[in-house]
C-alpha cells in the first residue's frame, strides 16, 4: 500500500511539473521575427536577426517545454529555409545542402550555454574566409584607380578570392584577401600602373569649289607626279582635289600650317574649322562648334486637342562642325585613329514645313605613323541659288514691266576635305 501511494505521488508530481512548463504553440502565418522574439523571451538567450530575413511561419498544436524548446526552434527554422549554426556568436547559414558538405557547426551546439547569440539569415551562404585574411591599400600613381579596378578583381578572384574596393579620394585600391596573394598582386598592379601616352590631334577642315580646286602641291612639298601612301598621284593636285569621287593620302611631316595658308589665299575655298584635341591613348576626344537648332517632332491641333490650346513638341539638335577622334598608340610607333568628323549646315531650301539640314560626315579607322598627316575628302554638297531683281514701280508696269525685272539661277558644288595630323606626346 505504501509502495502504491509513493508511485502515485511521483506520477502526480511529474504530471504537475510537465503541465506547468509545457505550452501548446500554434502559429498561423506569423512573421519569422515574431517567432524569434518569442523564443528569446522564453529562453532568455540573445538572438540576432539578419535584416534580410523575411517570411512567415505556420505551426499547429506543438507542445513545447524547456527540454525541447531549442530543438523546436531549430526545426521550425530549418523547415522554413533557415538553420541555426552554433558559434560564439552563433550564425545561421543556408542552404542546408551546402552546409552538409562543410563541417557541421551543429555538432557543437550547446543548449545550456548562456548568452549565445543566434543569427537568422536567408538562403545564401557567405564565401569561406581565408585563415590568413589581411587587408592592404595599394596606391596607384600613374593611372586612375578605377581603370585598374576590373583587372585587380580578376586577379584576386583567380587566386583564392577576396574583395577589391576603389578609393577614388586617394586614387588607391583597398584589397582584402589571403596574405599569400598580396605580394603577387602588388607586382601585378605595378606592372599595369604605367602612364599612357597622350596624342595631339590637329585638323584642318575646308571646302573648295568642284570647278576650281585649291592647289596644295606646294604645301604638301611634293613634286609634280609624286606618290604618297595609297597610290594617290599628286600631279596637278589642285585638279585632283576638285575631282568628284574623293581623295585620300598620307603625307610625312606637319603640313597643316602651309595648307591653311593655301586655303585662305584661294578665293574658291573656305576654311570650315581648325579643331585641335589632346587626349590619352585609348580615350576619345571630342570637339563641337555650331548651333542648337529646334526641330518640330510633333503637332496637335483640331479634334485631337482643344482648339484653344494647340501645342507642338520640339527636339533640339546640334548643327555645326564636330570632330571625334580615338587614338591608340601601338608599340611600334604606329597610331590607330578612329575618326568621326561631321559638318552640318542649315539648308536655304523651303520645300518642307520644317528645317532642312545638309549633312556631310566621314567615319573611318586608319593607321599612320607619329607625325604623319592624313587627307580625307570627297564629300560633295550642292547649293542652288535663285535671285530676283527688279526696279521699284517700273517692274510692275503692265506689258513692259518685264523689261525692268531679272531672274537668275546658280549652282555651286563644293567638296569638303579633312587634313589631320597626329603627334604622340610621351609620358614623363
UniProtKB/Swiss-Prot annotation:
Would you kindly state one Gene Ontology biological process term found in this protein's UniProt entry?
protein secretion
Q: Got a GO cellular component term for this one?
A: host cell membrane
**UniProt superkingdom:** Viruses
**Record's subcellular location:** Host membrane
Q: Which UniProt keywords apply?
A: Host membrane, Membrane, Signal, Transmembrane, Transmembrane helix, Viral extrusion, Viral release from host cell
Q: Which residues cross the membrane?
A: 319-339
Q: Which InterPro entries match?
A: Bact_Secretion_Sys_Channel, GspD-like_N0, GspD/PilQ, NolW-like, NolW-like_sf, T2SS/T3SS_dom, T2SS_GspD_CS
Give the signal sequence positions.
Answer: 1-22
Topology relative to the membrane, per the entry?
Answer: Single-pass type I membrane protein
* Family per record: Belongs to the inovirus G4P protein family.
What is said about its interaction partners and assembly? Answer: Homomultimer. The channel is composed of 14 G4P subunits that confer a barrel-like structure. Interacts with G1P; this interaction results in a complex that spans the inner an outer host membranes.
Query: What is the role of the protein in this entry?
Result: Acts in the assembly and extrusion of the bacteriophage by forming a channel across the host outer membrane. This channel is just large enough to allow a newly synthesized phage particle to pass through. Extrusion is a process of concomitant assembly and secretion and takes place at specific assembly sites where host inner and outer membranes are in close contacts.
Tell me the protein's name: Virion export protein
Where does this protein come from, organism-wise?
Enterobacteria phage I2-2
